[in-house]
Amino acid sequence: MIIVKSEREIELMRRAGKITAAARALAGEMVKPGVTTQEIDRAVEHFIRKQGAVPSFLHFPGPPGVRAFPGSVCASVNDEIIHGIPGPRVLQEGDIVSIDVGAYIGGYHGDCAATFPCGKVSPEAQNLIDVTRQSFFEGIKFAKEGCRLYDISAAIQGYAESHGCSIVREYVGHGIGTEMHESPEIPNYGHPGRGPRLLRGMT
């Protein structure tokens, strides 16, 4: 079930979102040759806690038989696709690094991600970053009342594929609120006009 939030709930979510966005920006500034993903993780955790929030990802439970997530950020380098565990890996010139950050405050979560170039990257890597970012904004255009859920998915897929990129189909976006992962699941591919109709207050 997709939870529709009140204006007050969305204001509380904004607080978490602003902390999360600032933490992601800090992480992005640290993506430089010679820095480890663990150093980024520790700096982000310190920043989030300084704001009075708690890192959403730290000790997030995994599926049965998988240990809880050990970091405050997901740091995925080059061909790693999401949920990369921060550690002693030293970033190199030309790497691209996806940073995913979450913060919890006042009963609500914030969650955001972005991919950053480490120093000078290849034209192909920069194109991937640029197309991915714009695909996100193409999807956002349809995240409004009256659209269908898969209008978002189709816009992302259409832009990415029309610019020579492909879609990762094994992972999806998700709703958020008092829980880190709420309904609905939002794939990055699909047919427009399908899925639930979006209502004001869905997050």
What are these regions (language model features)?
Residues M1-T203:
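Active-site neighborhoods and metal-handling regions in enzymes and metal-associated proteins
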